UniProtKB/Swiss-Prot annotation:
Domain notes: The leucine-rich repeats and the NTF2-domain are essential for the export of mRNA from the nucleus. The C-terminal fragment, containing the TAP domain (also called UBA-like domain) and part of the NTF2-like domain, named the NPC-binding domain, mediates direct interactions with nucleoporin-FG-repeats and is necessary and sufficient for localization of NXF1 to the nuclear rim.
Organism annotation: Drosophila melanogaster
Family per similarity comment: Belongs to the NXF family.
Protein name: Nuclear RNA export factor 1
Coiled-coil segments: none
Gene, per the UniProt record: sbr
Compositional bias annotation for Polar residues: 553-563
InterPro entries assigned to the protein according to its UniProt record, in alphabetical order: Leu-rich_rpt, LRR_dom_sf, NTF2-like_dom_sf, NTF2_dom, Nuclear_transport_factor_2_euk, Nucleotide-bd_a/b_plait_sf, NXF_fam, RBD_domain_sf
Oligomer and partners: Interacts with Nxt1. Interacts with ZC3H3. Forms a complex with Nup358/RanBP2, RanGAP and Nxt1. Interacts with Nup54 and Nup58. Interacts with Orc3 and Hpr1.
GO terms of biological process kind: mRNA export from nucleus; nuclear export; poly(A)+ mRNA export from nucleus; positive regulation of RNA export from nucleus
UniProt modified residues of type Phosphoserine: 561
Bias (Basic residues) ranges: 40-49
Tissue specificity comment: Expressed ubiquitously.
Length: 672
């Protein structure tokens, strides 16, 4: 049927309308036919073209930071690590060659784990599916791990690359007895990891089984494959899992000397930051058969005195063709290294230089005069017991009539806004305009100082975290600085649950104590407050279940009644200064007796007037409370300690200190 517009074909007619047009002879198009055939011939040829990048618009974008790469490598669902080609490509550029096979090659990943998915197989039993897979792969076998059934599929994992590749190429060959074809899909992936208390407890039990107490060595090689962890996936190559393992080591075996981490697919050592403080005795470290890409990852271990190191079968080892160069680079990071990859190293050539004097050993506290240690300890005990009580007005007798108090804290951008203390802030970098602003928050006078402290929220200081520097101690004055942590408690004091809601703060308080009449009092005090660091908070929470043996009285201490201890307290100790012949007081006896019925200093319970074992029941209860307060043991274990020593308080304190140093007191003794 002829087409509209004239003629049976428009090949020789340029008319594009409905009517006739100019006629062109066929011989005029001979050259056109030749060119048209050539174009069709060229179009049938396969060609390869490249798309321009959609996201890299600038050469600077090509360079990726190492931390970005590490974050992508540790992605939870491993979506960016999938290297297998999709089973059914949804699109292909015209002219690109068609893949010959149905499945792409499964590329090995750095973690060595692969996820197998069986779509719509959730209605079948595990034995049925596994038998069909093994029959299709015969004579090859594999062991599926972490099998789980999802809503519309079955998922399991394998750490055998060859087995994963064979499963991927099964295609339609694997089928069930009813004819259903499995069609497994394989991609890179790792099992899910949920770190909770139950998970950590299983890790702890398994690690205890692998610890050698004689050699202080812990073997965590191929830890995820331990039979005790069969039901959970515990990959040490994940930073959070390795961090949990290091926490367990730090809490239970801080004296660890040898650690074996062979064959765990570890590619990053970020979890080992600060390990020199947490495991200071670590000297032997095995990291063989892992995925450590370069020696730069071992910088976090540079502060450890590593004597033996294993790095065989790691990418960082293969980067050096010259073994001597590799040894030299490792020794630059670990100068004390003696053995590397099982081979003893030759001694390094060093110059015989005269050894320089070493720095003095750091200590928690500094005392310019040891005679002032007991005085300061008594002062802190009484002062902070009143400070943490409900009535801080009792501190009036502790301050001089012309005492001065200054409170400061860092800027909000550095430490966060400390709302409860911010109005007292006298940070001079913040108050630059005018003398009035700089002196407005300087408290002058006894009443102003105590009133300011009374406006603080309720606090609870932790004596275990205290450090003391006594810089001046003579007959004219004593100057000392106290640092530590305290809890800022919730203002709802009537609600018992509010006692558990608190923020941890760090403080530094400097006192200038001078003689006044027949006693001593605080002449000047400066206070610095800031938020506690994450490490300080972690150590603070850990110390809540540990005793404070430093608060225990010495066996040679005189022991008096609670009332006498409250009245005397610091006064008797201050007589050693030789300033006053009569009683000397920083704090008066009455407010202390009213706020602290049991003295936690060296004077606690009388044993001079009453023979051991002959106390009445009320005295025994006071002794139990004093023992519990000083040792941090609960009431039951405090009573047991006193009963076994025939209610001799000094002997009970001596026995407690001895057993505590030997780690023979069970943890339940400190659970209240």
């Amino acid at each position: 049927m002829p087409k509209r517009g004239g003629g049976s074909s428009q090949r020789y007619n340029n008319n594009v309308g409905n009517g006739g047009g100019r006629y062109n002879a066929p011989e005029d198009f001979d050259d056109f036919d030749v060119e048209d055939r050539q174009r069709r011939k060229d179009r049938n040829k396969r060609r390869v073209s490249f798309k321009p990048s959609q996201c890299l618009h600038n050469k600077k974008d090509i360079k990726l930071r190492p931390e970005d790469l590490r974050r992508w490598d540790e992605d939870d669902d491993m979506s960016d690590m999938t290297t297998a080609v999709k089973d059914r490509p949804t699109s292909r550029r015209r002219g690109s060659p068609i893949p010959r096979g149905k499945f792409g090659k499964l590329m090995p990943n750095s973690f060595g784990w692969y996820q197998v998915t069986l779509q719509n197989a959730q209605i079948y039993e595990k034995e049925t599916l596994l038998s069909a897979l093994l029959a299709a792969m015969s004579p090859h076998v594999f062991i599926p791990q972490y099998w789980r059934v999802e809503r519309n599929c079955v998922i399991f994992f394998t750490d055998d690359y060859e087995a994963a590749e064979r499963i991927q190429h099964l295609g339609k060959n694997g089928h069930l007895p009813d004819g259903y074809r499995l069609m497994p899909r394989v991609r890179s992936g790792i099992p899910l990891v949920a770190i909770d208390d139950a998970f950590k407890e299983k890790m702890k039990v398994t690690m205890a089984k692998r610890y050698n107490i004689q050699t202080k060595a812990l073997d965590l090689s191929r830890f995820h494959a331990d039979p005790d962890l069969k039901q959970v996936f515990c990959p040490l190559f994940r930073q959070n899992v390795m961090g949990a393992a290091i926490d367990i080591m730090c809490d239970n075996i801080p004296d660890l000397e040898a650690l074996n981490l062979n064959d765990n697919s570890i590619s990053s050592m970020e979890a080992f930051k600060g390990v020199e403080k947490r495991l200071p005795n670590l000297k032997i470290l095995y990291l063989g058969d892992n995925k450590i890409p370069s020696l730069a990852h071992l910088v976090v271990l540079r502060n450890l005195s590593i004597l033996e190191l294993v790095l065989k079968n790691n990418p960082c080892r293969s980067r050096y063709k010259d073994s001597q160069q590799f040894i030299s680079e490792v020794r630059r990071k670990f100068p004390k290294l003696v053995k590397l990859d099982g081979e003893t190293l030759e001694p390094q050539i060093t110059f015989d230089l005269s050894e320089q004097g070493r720095l003095l050993e750091t200590k928690a506290s500094y005392l310019c005069d040891v005679a002032g240690a007991e005085v300061v300890r008594q002062f802190l005990d009484q002062y902070f017991r009143i400070f943490d009580s409900g009535n801080r007005q009792a501190l009036l007798d502790a301050y001089h009539e012309k005492a001065m108090l200054s409170i400061s804290m860092p800027s909000a951008s550095q430490a966060g806004r400390l709302n409860s203390f911010w109005k007292f802030n006298r940070n001079l970098r913040r108050l630059l305009n005018g003398e009035e602003n700089r002196t407005r928050n300087l408290k002058y006078g006894r009443l102003a100082c105590v009133s300011t402290l009374d406006e603080w929220p309720k606090t609870q200081h932790d004596r275990r975290t205290f450090t003391v520097d006594l810089t001046i101690y003579n007959t004219s004055m004593m100057v000392f600085t106290v640092t530590g942590l305290f809890k800022e408690l919730n203002d709802e004091t009537n609600n018992p649950a509010s006692m558990e809601l608190y923020d941890v703060r760090h403080f530094a308080r400097t006192y200038v104590v001078v003689p006044q009449n027949n006693g001593f009092c605080i002449r000047n005090e400066t206070i610095f407050i800031t938020n506690a660091t994450h490490e300080q908070v972690r150590e603070f929470k850990r110390s809540q279940h540990q005793p404070a043996p430093g608060a225990m009285p010495s066996t040679s201490s005189a022991v008096t009644s609670p009332q006498a201890g409250a009245a005397a307290g610091l006064q008797g100790r201050l007589n050693a200064l030789g300033v006053a012949t009569g009683p000397v007081a920083i704090l008066s006896g009455d407010p202390l007796a009213a706020t602290a019925p049991v003295n936690s200093g060296s004077a606690a319970i009388s044993t001079t007037a009453v023979a051991p074992g002959a106390q009445d029941e009320s005295t025994k209860m006071q002794m139990i409370e004093a023992m519990s307060a000083q040792s941090q043991m609960n009431v039951i274990w405090s009573r047991k300690c006193l009963e076994e020593t025939n209610w001799d308080f000094n002997h009970a304190a001596f026995v407690f200190e001895k057993l505590f140093k030997e780690n023979k007191i069970p943890p339940e003794a400190f659970m209240k």
